[in-house]
């Protein structure tokens, strides 16, 4: 992925799995919990898993998904 490099430093500091409830907090508000839930319901979000009642994302999948939607502006 062409934008993958911008997330390399972030990847090293995150846990391997992130709950949907914490994505916004961990990524500095880049995407809200509600927006992520809506994208998931439309099949447009990152790959997800359910652990108990929580929706979670592998950090690798989440960052890969973000990289495909990132446009670097000059």
How should each PLM-predicted stretch be described?
Residues 4-35, 68:
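Polyanion-binding surface elements
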Residues 62-74:
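A short, Lys/Arg-enriched interface patch at domain edges and termini
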Residues 22, 61-62:
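Short, well-ordered alpha-helical scaffold segment located
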Residues 26-56:
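Major-groove DNA-recognition helix of helix-turn-helix-type DNA-binding domains
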Residues 5, 40-42, 63:
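Intrinsic disorder/low-complexity detector
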Residues 13, 50-52, 56, 60, ...:
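Small/flexible residues
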């Amino acid at each position: 992925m062409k934008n993958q490099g911008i997330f390399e430093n972030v990847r090293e500091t995150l846990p391997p799995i992130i709950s949907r409830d914490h994505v916004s907090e961990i990524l500095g508000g880049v995407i809200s919990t509600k927006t992520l839930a809506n994208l998931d319901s439309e099949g447009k979000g990152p790959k997800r898993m359910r652990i108990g009642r929580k929706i979670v994302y592998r950090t690798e999948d989440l960052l890969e998904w973000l990289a495909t939607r990132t446009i670097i502006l000059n």
